[in-house]
Amino acid sequence: MNRFFFALLVLFTVPVLAAPQDDQYTLGPDSQIQKSVPQGKVIQMPAWTNSKIYPGTTRDWWIYVPAQYKAEQPANVMVFCDGGGFVKLDGPFRVPVVFDNLIAKGQMPVTIGIFINPGAFPTSNPKDKPRSNRSFEYDSLGDLHARFLIEEIFPEVAKIYQITSDPEGRAICG
């Protein structure tokens, strides 16, 4: 009986291991800066340190504003959790570049991007690494993370840019 299960394991594992692996992902044209496309701007915001929902944490965050943004018209908004990995113009995702290209082609509406990293608790010793709050923020059941965005981050962004309050104009990923 054990040989039977071992044979099944080998039968299903070997083809998977022998299958050719994908080469590294090649960025498509929408991930490349196009000289003819107006480029939005990425603003690194001051570290967020005054959270009432996640007290004691500090986090880095950025706002992307498309070139087509007009202050008199509410923009859609998309939040990127683990935002530091998505906001880099030369990184693996290049979201600001993709947004620039898709907005310019009319394939997506004018959308402000909020790129936010999970919080961390600073240490008293600068040599120590801060304790991450990522798992608590992203993996906990409940409404804390949604409330953090709706009650703290969106109002802060709305002090500078007009963003939609329509749920159909909001998205989150990461």
For each feature predicted by the language model, list its residue ranges.
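Positively charged n-region of N-terminal signal peptides that target proteins for export
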Residues: M1-F4
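Bacterial N-terminal signal peptides
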Residues: F6-P15
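Non-catalytic cap/lid and distal C-terminal segments of serine-dependent acyl enzymes
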Residues: A19-G174
